[in-house]
Every structure is written in structure tokens, then in C-alpha cells.
From Swiss-Prot:
Its EC number is 2.1.1.228. Monomer. Residues 478-509 are annotated as: Disordered. Pfam families: TRM5-TYW2_MTfase, TYW2_N_2. The gene is TRMT5. Keywords: Cytoplasm, Methyltransferase, Mitochondrion, Nucleus, S-adenosyl-L-methionine, Transferase, Transit peptide, tRNA processing. GO terms for biological process: mitochondrial tRNA methylation; tRNA N1-guanine methylation. It catalyses: guanosine(37) in tRNA + S-adenosyl-L-methionine = N(1)-methylguanosine(37) in tRNA + S-adenosyl-L-homocysteine + H(+). Residues 1-57 form a transit peptide. This is tRNA (guanine(37)-N(1))-methyltransferase.
Length: 509
């Protein structure tokens, strides 16, 4: 039984107070007698007026405990197992705290109640009072505010200054599909205990998901939820195989939305256009693209062996570097040409459509012969990027004895940035050993390894950076007249070395 009394505290506002919650075990015949006795006692007390007994008081509720309903903003339980999205099934009414205020002070008050106000998708934090046109109701966060004592000291001070009672009332708020977050919807729909897909890679208007087997029965619903809950997304696709073909693109299925895969993305100030279904693009590599770009300075030369649509080549060309970019995929080659023109670097980038090995042993070899024969004052720094993590290490064999004649000074030897995946417990050591095995040398003392990102559990993407040793690059070595004594191999100058145990992690967006 709940007993309510109205108490007028000194000089502020009226309050409803619950005296105590009683568990009645006596005979029902005793209840009226006890009630009558308590009524007489309270009526004699000054300043206290008895209102009556209620099981629930809708406008000024009983003081609540600090126990919170963790499922308050969860969708209805009967949506569990839904495979075809029915938005109407997500309607739900919840009881939340509100604060009644005069409409003319709402703007001033809301600046001070940001912490306490309810924040839910599609829900206004201030609504009209259905019983008073001159008042407004501020919806409060039920996980933060459950009695007037839940307000912070600063908030109470503002309320008092504006002559607003901190008395909390309840309001029945109707929630719909629009008011739930994507993660809340998917958690309610998928079987309990299963992983929920709430993240994806955004490629222009396309949401690219990698669904797991247990999520496939819900794939159409998941795709539609991603479109509904992410402004600008009009198509959701799922990768249905690994990137294992010669062109580095993957087969995908459209889960929901439009079939159009022609898209435009902006990365690090540059714009790229392409058909996402026919080329490779990974938005999670934007930080890595910037990292490599920062290593080059004006006048340097870049050979991009697996250039894709240009995320390395174009930013580097913008730094007034000379770029030679290659990709075997005819679609990537087409969009690389297009994007170079789009970003106004087409005069600084020479583009090829060759196999990576043919590119290295053809155009790269020819250019290196010219570049490395220049005088010391004119020699640029030469970088070779090989971003094909599944196979790039295999292409390192193309550097063995690539050049004839007299080696250049060690400081001008080309710098290679080669990407690879590793599932080894020590991925940096693994990549060094595999790259060294292909080249026929040890790279332990003359390379650095950068951890690019975690691809999957126990699978890392890394970049090993090193200068190609003269013993590898040149077929017939003779004494270099510029160097009376060839110094031992050293770590290359432009990439930061680190220990195998403390691999630096680059965060990607």
C-alpha cells in the first residue's frame, strides 16, 4: 500500500511525498481501522494535507529507487526473429520523467539542462503541455533523472533562479521505429547472444557490410536498417567472397536499396569516382595513404605498382612529385585516368595497365636506369609502393638483379613500401622473414614494419619499408667511385623503426 501526502515546504513549492511502502500481511478487516487512525493523526499535523491512497499516481509519481529499466528503450520483444522489416511492429509506449516549465524560459533553461534532457533519435526534447498552452514539458533522461534529487547542484540553482519547481512528473511517450538506433533494432531482431552488425564501410552512398553466417537470414532487414538509419546511404551491399581474383575486386550482392554502384568519395581533400563493383577501394586505409604521402617531398619520384583508382598516386602528385602509376585491372586503369584529370594532376602522373611484375621489369627498370645515373645533386628520392597485401611480397623477386652496371650510392637506393597480411603471433617478424626469403637476404637490421590495421581476429595488415640493397638490385657490382668503402646496410631514412614487440598501430577511418 502506498500513502501519499501533500506537503508545502517553506517558501518554495508543493511536493508529493511517499511516507512508506508497506507490505500488508494482516487481515483485510484491519486495514480500514488502521487507515482511519492514520488519517486522524495526520490531519492534526500543521501543513500536511492528506490526498488519499493510490496504487499509481500519473502526474507526480512516487519517489523511485535507483534501479533502472535497462530495456526501457529497447524495441518490443515480439520483433525477435523478424526477417522482413515491419516498421509498425516497433511501436512502444514508455513512461519517462518530464519537467513542466513556462514556455518563455525554455531556451534559457535548455542550455543548462543538456545533461538531464532526453536524447533519442527523432524525439523532440521539448513538447507542448496538453493541459496548459502556456507551459511546455521538457523530456528528461530516465537513466539520469528519476526524482528532483537527481538534478545536479548547478541545475537546481538555475531552476531556482527561473522560479521553476524541480518537481518531476511522468509522461507516456510513444516510441516508433524512427526512435530506435540501428544497433538497438538489430539486437532486438537477431537471436539473443548473437553478434550484431552495426558498423560498415561507407563508400559514397554505399554501405559495405561483411555479414557473418548467422546474420545471413536477416540480411535484407539489416541492409534496409542501415539505409534507414544513415542519412545519405541509399544502397547496402554484402561481400560474398574474399578478394582473391587478379583484379582485387570482390563479388557483392545488393541487400537493399538501389543497384547503382557508381559512386564518388572524398578522401584527404581529394575526390575519387569509380564503379565500386569493379574496382578495389577501402575507406579504412585513408590514414595509411596520408602516412606514405607525408614521406615524400617535392621533386621525389613514386612508382605505384598496384595503384587502384589513385589514393596514393594523386596526393603524392599534388606535392609536385613525379608519379608512375600502374594497375592490371582495366576498370581501375580507366578510373585512375579519370581521377587524375578530376584532381588536375594528369600532367604529373604516367599511367600503365600492366601486370605488376611487367611494370617493375619494364617502365620501372627504365626509369631507375635514368634516375640513378644522375649526379648526386640531381638525384631524387625514389619510393616504390606495393599495396597488394595478399601477394605483394611475391613480387619482390622482380627486384633481384634488376639493374646492370655500377651501383649508385647506398643513400639513393630505392625505398620500398610493401604491404602484407600476417596471422603470425609475431606479425612484424613474420613479414620481415617472408620478404627477406624472397629477396635472398636478411631484412632484420635494415627494415621497419608498420602495423596498418587489424583486418580480422588474428589477422593483421602491415607495411614493411626498406631500401633495396645494392647486392639485390644490381647484377654485376663494381666499386662505386663515389664511395671508397660501401657502408653496411642501415635502416632506411624516412620510415620510423620500431621493435617487433611494440608495433605502432595506425588508426584508420
Amino acid at each position: 500500500m502506498v500513502l501519499w501526502i501533500l506537503w508545502r515546504p517553506f517558501g518554495f513549492s508543493r511536493r508529493l511525498l511517499k511516507l512508506e511502502r508497506h507490505s500488508i500481511t494482516e487481515s483485510k478487516s484491519l486495514i480500514p481501522l488502521a487507515w482511519t487512525s492514520l488519517t486522524q493523526t495526520l490531519s492534526e499535523s500543521p501543513g500536511i494535507f492528506l490526498l488519499g491512497q493510490r496504487k499509481r499516481f500519473s502526474t507526480m509519481p512516487e519517489i523511485e529507487t535507483h534501479e533502472r529499466d535497462s530495456e526501457l528503450f529497447s524495441p518490443p520483444s515480439d520483433v525477435r526473429g523478424m526477417t522482413k522489416l515491419d516498421r509498425t511492429a516497433f511501436k512502444k509506449t514508455v513512461n519517462i520523467p518530464v519537467l513542466k516549465v513556462r514556455k518563455e524560459i525554455v531556451s534559457r533553461l535548455m542550455r543548462s539542462l543538456r545533461r538531464a534532457a532526453l536524447q533519442r533519435p527523432g524525439i523532440k526534447r521539448v513538447i507542448e503541455d496538453p493541459e496548459d498552452k502556456e507551459s511546455r514539458l521538457i523530456l528528461l533522461d530516465p537513466y539520469k533523472i528519476f526524482t528532483h534529487d537527481s538534478f545536479e547542484k548547478a541545475e537546481l540553482s538555475v531552476l531556482e533562479q527561473l522560479n521553476v519547481s524541480p518537481q518531476i512528473s511522468k509522461y507516456n511517450l510513444e516510441l516508433t521505429y524512427e526512435n530506435f538506433k540501428s544497433e538497438e533494432i538489430l539486437r532486438a531482431v537477431l537471436p539473443e547472444g548473437q553478434d550484431v552488425t552495426s558498423g560498415f564501410s561507407r563508400v559514397g552512398h554505399i554501405a559495405h557490410l561483411n555479414l557473418r553466417d548467422h546474420q545471413l537470414p536477416f540480411k535484407q532487414l539489416i541492409g534496409q536498417v542501415m539505409i534507414d538509419k544513415n542519412p545519405g546511404i541509399t544502397s547496402a551491399v554484402n561481400k560474398i567472397n574474399n578478394i582473391d581474383n587478379m583484379y582485387r575486386n570482390f563479388h557483392m550482392e545488393v541487400l537493399s536499396g538501389e543497384q547503382n554502384m557508381m559512386t564518388k568519395v572524398r578522401e584527404n581533400k581529394y575526390t575519387y569516382e569509380f564503379d565500386f563493383s569493379k574496382v578495389y577501394w577501402n575507406p579504412r586505409l585513408s590514414t595509411e595513404h596520408s602516412r606514405i604521402t607525408e614521406l615524400l617531398k617535392a621533386g621525389d619520384v613514386l612508382f605505384d605498382v598496384f595503384a587502384g583508382v589513385g589514393p596514393f598516386a594523386i596526393p603524392v602528385a599534388k606535392k609536385n612529385c613525379t608519379v608512375f602509376a600502374n594497375d592490371l585491372n582495366p576498370e581501375s586503369h580507366k578510373w585512375l585516368l579519370h581521377n587524375c584529370k578530376l584532381n588536375k594532376v594528369d600532367q604529373k602522373v604516367k599511367i600503365f595497365n600492366l601486370d605488376g611484375k611487367d611494370f617493375l621489369q619494364g617502365p620501372v627498370k627504365e626509369e631507375l636506369i635514368q634516375l640513378l645515373s644522375l649526379s648526386k645533386e640531381r638525384k631524387p628520392s625514389v619510393h616504390i609502393v606495393m599495396n597488394l597485401p595478399a601477394k605483394a611480397i611475391e613480387f619482390l623477386s622482380a627486384f633481384k638483379w634488376l639493374l646492370d652496371g655500377q651501383p649508385c650510392s647506398n643513400e639513393f637506393l630505392p625505398i620500398v613500401h610493401c604491404y602484407s597480411f600476417s596471422k603470425d603471433a609475431n606479425p612484424a617478424k613474420d613479414v620481415r622473414q617472408r620478404a627477406g626469403a624472397v629477396l635472398g637476404i636478411s631484412l632484420e637490421a635494415c627494415s621497419s614494419v608498420h602495423l596498418v590495421r587489424n583486418v580480422a581476429p588474428n589477422k593483421e595488415m602491415l607495411c614493411i619499408t626498406f631500401q633495396i640493397p645494392a647486392a639485390v638490385l644490381y647484377k654485376n657490382q663494381t666499386k662505386n667511385p663515389e664511395n671508397h668503402e660501401d657502408p653496411p646496410l642501415k635502416r632506411q631514412r624516412t620510415a620510423e623503426a620500431f621493435s617487433d614487440e611494440k608495433t605502432q598501430i595506425a588508426s584508420n577511418t
